[in-house]
Regions:
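Structured alpha/beta or helical-core interaction and ligand-binding surfaces enriched in interleaved
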Residues: 1-103, 107-157
């Protein structure tokens, strides 16, 4: 299995990716939204993999048998404040949670439509978010990751 959403994985699996603003891993009612989306489109186990070095004694990976709101909340607690990848057993549905106030959601179009009924509108909304973030003092790293997130949505052009 993998630890990141790579362009090769996206190409090899034939899935698509969308970026979304997210100051924390899950906001508002997203536990329900994500649980419902994974249950409907990718039934089976979910895996969470940290993309960071973890202190000794901390789990690097977590598996849950079902995607329920409670299970997703436990995963969010386990990986609080860290980059982590949440993906389905078939590895065709994934969410990369970042520390840079956004997440990437990848999968077949029906999976993406559960989050974003209008994909073009979501791309515009994320570009507005990126532009606003870059209007404040920021590091080159922030600019790089936000620009890269937008490039993941180039398939919509």
């Amino acid at each position: 299995s993998q630890r990141a959403l790579s362009r090769k994985w996206i190409s090899d699996t034939g899935v698509f990716a969308m970026a979304a603003e997210g100051i924390v891993h899950f906001v508002d009612d997203e536990y329900k939204l994500f649980a419902d989306a994974f249950r409907a489109e990718a039934p089976g186990r979910l895996f969470g993999i940290s993309n960071e070095d973890r202190p000794p004694g901390w789990d690097h990976a977590v598996m849950v048998e079902q995607s329920t709101e409670d299970e997703l909340e436990q995963i969010a607690i386990e990986f609080f404040g860290q980059y982590f990848l949440l993906f389905s057993e078939d590895e065709r549905h994934a969410v990369l949670f970042t520390q840079a106030d956004y997440k990437l959601i990848a999968g077949p179009l029906p999976f993406l439509h559960r989050f974003f009924p209008d994909l073009s509108a979501q791309k515009r909304e994320f570009i507005e978010f990126k532009n606003e973030e870059l209007s404040y003092p920021h590091t080159a790293w922030v600019e790089l990751v936000l620009e890269n997130a937008v490039r993941f949505m180039d398939w919509l052009d």
